[in-house]
Amino acid sequence: EKAPLKQARLIHDWVRTHMHRDDSVIGCGTGDVGEILKSGKLGGKCTDINSVFVALCRAAGIPAREMFGIRLGASRKLAQYSKGAFGSADTNGVAKISGAQHCRAMFWLAGYGWLPADPADVTKMRLAEKKENGNPDVEAVNEYLFGNIEMNWVGFNHGRDFALSPQAEQGDINNFGYPYAEVDGDPVN
């Protein structure tokens, strides 16, 4: 396939089909594609899974990037498929944002600009609802998350490997999916 949109779709479908969400991974994962592929364990959380999508798009010549942000409440569009996989809120509709960090992917399509893709959320829904690929709900979520963003999410940045000044004790910061602070040279967790 030579058309970039179709290539990106094939990559999205491959990633959501062959990768799995691993809830034992800390935070959103590190997005270390080399390590994921070398280990042969095609799993992780949103940064890991969407970083594989980004890497495969780039390998096919499609500009792509991760986008780090946070969910600001319960999903309206996708809640019919999963009550917890796409954000949450209390009974008054107030967002539960502790742990709501989420990495999405974006790819560039000439004439359109940056388009969203989120195979990681397909794997999250699959695990949360104990459904397999091919299930109509999984397929509906997959269809929506290629080219759409649920409007309960806001992106903050798309950077990786930040070199802070003064330099962080741990060296470059992988991403700003979470706040980072140090006190007297010690990272605050």
Regions inferred by a protein language model and the residue ranges of each:
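Active-site rim recognition segments
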Residues: A74, L78, G84-N189
